[in-house]
């Protein structure tokens, strides 16, 4: 089974990835879990309905297991749900020798990691992601909840004990969720390797390919790219910011849509094309953007806006981005594919780029 080692400054841990990862690690994982006083599983309603029985089968011999089922989607990453999870943990008698399992997509991983990092000043946790999107968020230790004014504004850096990534769960993902997660795979290729991007474009040409082609080697490569960056810069003081390519504009768009209008990967896709457009302006990026947009459309990504998104809202949300310092908005741009750079963008440039990609319902991207 493919195994990747993440060597962050604070912790070294494995990422297990294949179609039957849970079965493959079951013996040694349950042996490790048995050492804890209490196992607390955080999941959401959708995952619980489809896959709880699989986890039950593995945890059946453990003496104390408690589940908390959070709301589906970004609604789970709120103060209200965070407090409710904490209340459940306290009422269930979890002590500092307890362990948390985040069983779900990126939202559950973010929430679960933040809960684990703050409960009694920190308890261990495991990431058991169930979505394509979570191949990015489950690795690297960035955990957070949202604030109404910005995404992931309240958070921490807190590494898991391990990531157990069982790709059999993908079979139940809706196409829209698959596409959302695939956007992060595209991001990893854009910031690291044109050859990887070309392989993605040649392998995945229509939506059904998400289910019929093998995602695992591409997911593994994306995780390796991220693990290498995290090893250099765990707390995002430098190169780790490159992983935010497309996220400055994308997060601003998510906030404008109240974290419900667009899925994360959908917003990030718009954000990546916004950043590619700005990269053409600033660095003369040599990249066939027209071919790239056509490929996205063939995969089912929406490349038009049917609503007017006010620039004032986007700009204000971009100012709340975590990379913004001294009121200067930092963008991750590309000098060329695989060569990202941090660029401090002035409002005029942000607006000019905005006008190029947001044409009030025309083919914005």
UniProtKB/Swiss-Prot annotation:
NCBIfam families: aroB. Its main location: cytoplasm. The keyword Hydrolase does not apply. NAD(+) binds at residues 106-110, 130-131, 142, 151, 169-172. Zn(2+) binds at residues 184, 247, 264. Signal peptide: none annotated. This is 3-dehydroquinate synthase. It catalyses: 7-phospho-2-dehydro-3-deoxy-D-arabino-heptonate = 3-dehydroquinate + phosphate. GO terms for molecular function: 3-dehydroquinate synthase activity; metal ion binding; nucleotide binding. Pathway: Metabolic intermediate biosynthesis; chorismate biosynthesis; chorismate from D-erythrose 4-phosphate and phosphoenolpyruvate: step 2/7. Its EC number is 4.2.3.4. Belongs to the sugar phosphate cyclases superfamily. Dehydroquinate synthase family. GO terms for cellular component: cytoplasm. It comes from the Bacteria. It is found in: Cytoplasm. Transmembrane segments: none annotated. Binds 1 divalent metal cation per subunit. Can use either Co(2+) or Zn(2+). It comes from Listeria welshimeri serovar 6b (strain ATCC 35897 / DSM 20650 / CCUG 15529 / CIP 8149 / NCTC 11857 / SLCC 5334 / V8). One of its GO terms (biological process) is aromatic amino acid family biosynthetic process. Catalyzes the conversion of 3-deoxy-D-arabino-heptulosonate 7-phosphate (DAHP) to dehydroquinate (DHQ). Its cofactor is Co(2+); Zn(2+); NAD(+).
């Amino acid at each position: 089974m493919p195994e990747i080692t993440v060597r962050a400054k604070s912790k070294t841990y494995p990422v297990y990835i294949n179609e039957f990862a849970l079965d493959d690690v079951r013996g040694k994982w349950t042996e490790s879990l048995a050492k804890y006083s209490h196992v607390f599983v955080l999941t959401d309603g959708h995952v619980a309905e489809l896959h709880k029985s699989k986890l039950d089968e593995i945890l059946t011999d453990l003496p104390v297991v408690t589940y908390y089922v959070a709301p589906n989607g970004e609604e789970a990453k709120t103060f209200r749900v965070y407090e409710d999870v904490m209340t459940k943990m306290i009422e269930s008698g979890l002590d500092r020798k307890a362990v948390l399992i985040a069983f779900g997509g990126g939202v559950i991983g973010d929430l679960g990691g933040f809960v684990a990092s703050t409960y009694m000043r920190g308890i261990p946790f495991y990431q058991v992601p169930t979505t394509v999107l979570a191949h990015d968020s489950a690795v690297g230790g960035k955990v957070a909840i949202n604030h109404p004014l910005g995404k992931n504004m309240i958070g921490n850096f807190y590494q898991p004990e391990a990531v157990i990534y069982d790709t059999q769960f993908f079979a139940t993902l809706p196409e829209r969720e698959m596409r959302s997660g695939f956007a992060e795979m595209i991001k990893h290729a854009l910031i690291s390797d044109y050859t990887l991007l070309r392989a993605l474009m040649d392998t995945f040409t229509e939506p059904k390919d998400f289910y019929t082609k093998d995602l695992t080697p591409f997911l593994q490569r994306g995780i390796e790219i991220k693990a290498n960056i995290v090893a250099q810069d765990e707390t995002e003081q430098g190169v780790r910011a490159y992983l935010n390519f497309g996220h400055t504009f994308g997060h601003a768009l998510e906030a404008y849509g109240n974290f419900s209008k667009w899925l994360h990967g959908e917003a990030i896709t718009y954000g990546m094309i916004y950043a590619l457009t700005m990269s053409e302006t600033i660095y003369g990026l040599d990249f066939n953007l027209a071919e790239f947009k056509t490929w996205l459309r063939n995969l089912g990504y929406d490349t038009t806006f049917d609503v007017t998104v006010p620039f004032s809202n986007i700009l204000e949300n971009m100012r709340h981005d975590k990379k913004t310092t001294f009121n200067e908005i930092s963008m991750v741009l590309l000098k060329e594919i695989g060569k990202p750079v941090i660029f401090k963008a002035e409002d005029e440039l942000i607006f000019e780029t905005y006008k190029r990609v947001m044409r009030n319902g025309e083919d914005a991207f």
